[in-house]
């Protein structure tokens, strides 16, 4: 049984020859430990793809979660100059006059000098037409140029997973602050649900395109759906139906497992998360970070869902 087969067995509720091993490292960790060149790592598709593969080989992982699927290949051509920054970082000057500081172990910090467009604070300020419809045929050709070479090089031996951010995560991102998005759910439930519907249709496009390329599983990133943000009732209203639609579509059209990543306080809603049809759950945080005890969760979930570490 190879790694790909091992993961497939575990994700489908069967017994593999041993417990599979894989982990999603932070991009900062990958940059610090597997990026020979920070510019290549952050601004070329090859750099990040190589780091994903190197990490999996170093730690003998059974799978790779590709959390960033593509990178604009013209970015290096837009660089004017690269200088040395503090603590091993880099300072990038761009031809458009902006600049970025790249720490050795964290995301680039971009400084354009142009004030950011203010996002709405209230749902009445939200223009639904600003949620542009995503069409697969209109996606840039490079949208999956990190995922594709990983599938080509490691897809026969390792379990390769794709990822989408859920509609609810993106909905909160439409507003100036997270709390503004949460208040919007109360202030105008109908408008919020229409925004979620439109966003979920766009998420489906990215999910389908990754599935079509041959991923073995799809992760739904839903970090704000725990009790620290939403009650059970609001979860049922604003999260469950949209994640259920996404998972049912992937199951029906591609037959691959899906799993949900929600951090923190989810001990009160594991039963609701199962109602999405998910095949697995990721990130069962114990107290004090979360509200889930692994033993209790295992008994509740039973054979209905696999448990995956983060």
Please describe what each predicted stretch is.
Residues 1-42, 51, 114-310:
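Active-site loop segments of alpha/beta catalytic cores
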Residues 73-131, 157:
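A contiguous, low-structure linker/loop signature
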Residues 66-80, 165-168:
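Short, glycine/charge-rich beta-strand/loop segments that flank catalytic centers
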Residues 48-67, 209-216:
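Catalytic domains of carbohydrate-active enzymes, especially glycoside hydrolases
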Residues 55-58, 80-85, 150-154:
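Short, charge-rich binding segments
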Residues 45:
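Aromatic-acidic/polar surface patches that form glycan- and anion
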């Amino acid at each position: 049984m190879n790694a790909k087969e091992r993961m497939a067995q575990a994700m489908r509720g069967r017994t593999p020859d041993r417990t599979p091993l894989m982990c999603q490292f932070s991009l900062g960790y990958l940059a610090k430990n597997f990026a020979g060149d920070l510019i290549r790592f952050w601004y070329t598709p090859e750099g990040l793809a190589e780091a994903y593969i190197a990490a999996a080989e170093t730690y003998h992982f059974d799978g790779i979660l590709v959390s960033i699927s593509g990178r604009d290949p013209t970015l290096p051509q837009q660089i004017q100059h690269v200088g040395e920054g503090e603590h091993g970082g880099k300072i990038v000057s761009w031809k458009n006059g902006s600049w970025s500081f790249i720490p050795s172990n964290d995301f680039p910090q971009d400084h354009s000098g142009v004030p950011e467009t203010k996002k709405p604070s209230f749902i009445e300020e939200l223009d639904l037409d600003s949620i542009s419809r995503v069409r697969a045929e209109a996606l840039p050709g490079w949208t999956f140029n990190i995922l594709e070479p990983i599938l080509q090089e490691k897809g026969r031996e390792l379990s390769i997973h794709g990822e989408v951010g859920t509609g609810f995560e993106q909905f909160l991102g439409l507003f100036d602050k997270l709390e503004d998005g949460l208040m919007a759910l109360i202030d105008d439930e109908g408008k919020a649900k229409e925004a979620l519907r439109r966003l979920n249709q766009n998420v489906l496009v990215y999910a389908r395109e990754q599935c079509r390329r041959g991923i073995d599983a799809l992760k739904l990133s839903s970090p704000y759906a725990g009790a620290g943000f939403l009650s059970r009732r609001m979860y049922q209203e604003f999260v469950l139906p949209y994640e259920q639609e996404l998972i049912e579509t992937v199951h029906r059209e591609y037959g691959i497992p899906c799993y949900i990543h929600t951090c923190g306080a989810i001990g009160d809603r594991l039963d609701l998360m199962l109602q999405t049809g998910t095949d697995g759950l990721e990130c069962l945080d114990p107290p004090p970070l979360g509200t889930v005890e692994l033993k209790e969760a295992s008994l509740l979930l039973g054979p209905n869902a696999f448990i995956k570490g983060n």
